Amino acid sequence: MTTIEAVRNRILILCGERGITINRLATLSALPPSSIKNILYGKSENPKLITIKMICDGLDITLADFFDTVEFNTLEQELK
């Protein structure tokens, strides 16, 4: 799994747990829906940390909560 795949999966899992749509997440995060959709559908391969922070704020979680998962903790090194 790549880092961007882990980010996409985490957003989808968090939305699913809360029963919210991508559009609702965008509203809660004060982001345009296109920003989140670009991450989820592969148009944004390197989302900015501030965007992820705003998503976390909208979900009322910390960045640490967002990244503290098995997927992120077991990512392979990006440098090759």
Language-model features, listed with the residues they occupy:
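The alpha-helix within a helix-turn-helix
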Residues: 15, 26, 56
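Residues in the recognition helix of alpha-helical DNA-binding motifs
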Residues: 14, 28, 39, 69
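Short, basic-rich loop-to-helix N-cap that marks the start of a DNA-contacting helix
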Residues: 43-57
